[in-house]
Amino acid sequence: RRQRQMCIRDRSKALAEAKTAFEKDEVPVGAVIVSNDKIIARAHNLTEMLNDVTAHAEMQAITSAANYLGGKYLNDCTLYVTLEPCQMCAGAMYWAQLSRLVFGATDPHRGYRKLNTTLHPKTKVSYGVLSNECKLLIDAFFIKKRKLKKT
């Protein structure tokens, strides 16, 4: 029961990060990395603010977690992210040897599974967590962008 409560907390924190990104006119993706039931990194997309195509929530969180742990491997960590990671982020997860990935909404256009990108063999994956909330936030962002483009 405690484990389930921790998972709900971590998923909710990732969604809160995505909402922060939305408020900053960033693609609303949020990420949280957990080690030993403790959140060690939180991040959201910063690609617009930093003018950096690699500043995805997952990349920011991986860097922050590695700095916190004092090493590049995250083999005892879980990454909670609101959207299926892209190929670039999946590659970073592979090299970090992430033990578990949990994502909310799937990304049929740019998600890592579309191009059959593989994660580290030890990485366990689950998805569909808060998927509705995650998808609604992404959809709202792009609807807003399209409306602004028309005016």
Which role fits each region the language model picked out?
Residues 12, 35, 41-143:
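Zn2+-dependent cytidine deaminase-like catalytic core
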Residues 25, 72-75, 148-149:
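Short, structured loop/turn "capping" segments at alpha-beta junctions
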Residues 25-26, 97:
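Glycine-centered short loops/turns at secondary-structure junctions
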Residues 29-37:
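Short beta-strand scaffold segments in enzyme catalytic cores
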Residues 143-151:
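Glycine-rich adenosyl-binding loop in Rossmann-like folds that engage adenosine-containing cofactors
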